[in-house]
UniProtKB/Swiss-Prot annotation:
GO molecular function ontology, one term from the record: proton-transporting ATP synthase activity, rotational mechanism
Gene (UniProt): atpH
Role of this protein: F(1)F(0) ATP synthase produces ATP from ADP in the presence of a proton or sodium gradient. F-type ATPases consist of two structural domains, F(1) containing the extramembraneous catalytic core and F(0) containing the membrane proton channel, linked together by a central stalk and a peripheral stalk. During catalysis, ATP synthesis in the catalytic domain of F(1) is coupled via a rotary mechanism of the central stalk subunits to proton translocation. This protein is part of the stalk that links CF(0) to CF(1). It either transmits conformational changes from CF(0) to CF(1) or is implicated in proton conduction.
Descriptive protein name: ATP synthase subunit delta
Record's subunit section: F-type ATPases have 2 components, F(1) - the catalytic core - and F(0) - the membrane proton channel. F(1) has five subunits: alpha(3), beta(3), gamma(1), delta(1), epsilon(1). F(0) has three main subunits: a(1), b(2) and c(10-14). The alpha and beta chains form an alternating ring which encloses part of the gamma chain. F(1) is attached to F(0) by a central stalk formed by the gamma and epsilon chains, while a peripheral stalk is formed by the delta and b chains.
Length: 177
C-alpha cells in the first residue's frame, strides 16, 4: 500500500540511522522481520486493531511474542504502539530491508517466471543481471503462470519484460494504435 509506505518511510529511516550508529543493522533486521511476521498473524492483527487494549499492553505483547531483547527495538515498538502505527511494521521492515541492501551496495531483484526455474537457471540469470545492472543483486523468484512463457525481471523501478505476455501486449498495443 502506497499510504503505508509513506507513513513507514520516516520510521524506517530513523531506525536505520540509529542502527548504523549502534552497529546493529543486521541484528535489527532480524528483529523487524519477526515483528512484521507476527503483526500479520490473524489473532495478533485483531488485537492490534482492538481499541480497548491500550498501547503499552499491545507493545508488551508484541515484545514478548517476538522475544525482543534489544532496548532500542523495544522502544521503537513502544513508540509505534503509542502512535497507533503497529500495523505498518511489515512496511517498515520492507523499507528497512531496502535501506540495508542499499547500504551494502546490493539491489533487490524479482524474477517472475511462468514456470519454476532450476538453481542453474537462476544462477545464470543472476550472472547476466549482475552485469546488466552493474550491481550485486539479491534475487527472489516468483511463479506467475499468466506470463505464458519467458521471464519478467524487476530491479527497483526498472522492468525487463521478456515474457510471452509482454510481447503479446506490445503487439496488441502496436496493432491498436
Amino acid at each position: 500500500m502506497a499510504e503505508f509506505a509513506t507513513i513507514a518511510r520516516p520510521y524506517a529511516k530513523a531506525l536505520f540511522g540509529l542502527a548504523q550508529e549502534k552497529s546493529q543493522i543486521e541484528s535489527w533486521l532480524g528483529g523487524l522481520e519477526k515483528l512484521a511476521a507476527v503483526v500479520q498473524e490473524g489473532k495478533v492483527a485483531s488485537l492490534i486493531d482492538r481499541p480497548e487494549t491500550n498501547a503499552s499492553e499491545k507493545a508488551d505483547i508484541l515484545i514478548d511474542l517476538v522475544g525482543l531483547k534489544d532496548k532500542e527495538l523495544k522502544n521503537f515498538v513502544i513508540v509505534l504502539a503509542g502512535q497507533k502505527r503497529l500495523s505498518i511494521l511489515p512496511e517498515v521492515y520492507a523499507q528497512y530491508q531496502d535501506l540495508t541492501l542499499s547500504f551494502n551496495h546490493i539491489k533487490s531483484a524479482v524474477i517472475y517466471s511462468a514456470y519454476p526455474l532450476t538453481d542453474k537457471q537462476v544462477g545464470e540469470l543472476a550472472q547476466m543481471l549482475n552485469k546488466r545492472f552493474d550491481s550485486e543483486l539479491k534475487i527472489s523468484v516468483e511463479i506467475e503462470p499468466e506470463l505464458i512463457g519467458g521471464i519478467k525481471v524487476e530491479v527497483g523501478d526498472q522492468v525487463l519484460d521478456l515474457s510471452v505476455q509482454g510481447k503479446l501486449s506490445a503487439l496488441y498495443t502496436t496493432m491498436t494504435n
